[in-house]
Amino acid sequence: MYYYLITLAVIALDQLTKWIVVQNMEIGQKIEVIPGFLYWTSYRNDGAAWSILEGHMWFFYLITVVVIGIIIYIMQKYAKGKRLFSISLAFILGGAIGNFIDRVLHQEVVDFVQTVWGNYYFPIFNVADASLSVGVVLMLVYVFVDDRKTKGIK
């Protein structure tokens, strides 16, 4: 059940950071955090992570509810006793719920983290997006490690 605490922490941090951005920054405003690398940039997104499929909100409502239900089912049925698996699902669930809250309440998602690598500007994202990414990476690690254990590889 500890994994639900991770989910709640992700949701709380996501919503708090978005609230701070909305209360203190104009849309489009940019604050340099680490010169030439990291900026807080107030942006609104009506698509998925990194602005994928902008303008199709009904699709995200439906998909997100289904995904949240599936993740909770998997957590209850299969994740018990599998620490890395349950943690990865907790991060994915927290990210999904964090952005879902924005979509339901505001019909858009608040994004604000912007990174720059030389001349490349990575798409602006938020804590929920980062949590989804961390969850997927942890899931891949779990699958790789579990596969090696199953095959008896050290």
Swiss-Prot record:
Its EC number is 3.4.23.36. It catalyses: Release of signal peptides from bacterial membrane prolipoproteins. Hydrolyzes -Xaa-Yaa-Zaa-|-(S,diacylglyceryl)Cys-, in which Xaa is hydrophobic (preferably Leu), and Yaa (Ala or Ser) and Zaa (Gly or Ala) have small, neutral side chains. GO terms for cellular component: plasma membrane. InterPro entries: Peptidase_A8 (IPR001872). One of its GO terms (biological process) is proteolysis. It is a multi-pass membrane protein. The active site is at D111, D129. GO terms for molecular function: aspartic-type endopeptidase activity; endopeptidase activity. Pathway: Protein modification; lipoprotein biosynthesis (signal peptide cleavage). The chain crosses the membrane at residues 55-75, 84-104, 124-144. Keywords: Aspartyl protease, Cell membrane, Hydrolase, Membrane, Protease, Transmembrane, Transmembrane helix. Pfam families: Peptidase_A8. It is found in: Cell membrane. Belongs to the peptidase A8 family. This protein specifically catalyzes the removal of signal peptides from prolipoproteins. This is Lipoprotein signal peptidase. It comes from Listeria monocytogenes serovar 1/2a (strain ATCC BAA-679 / EGD-e).
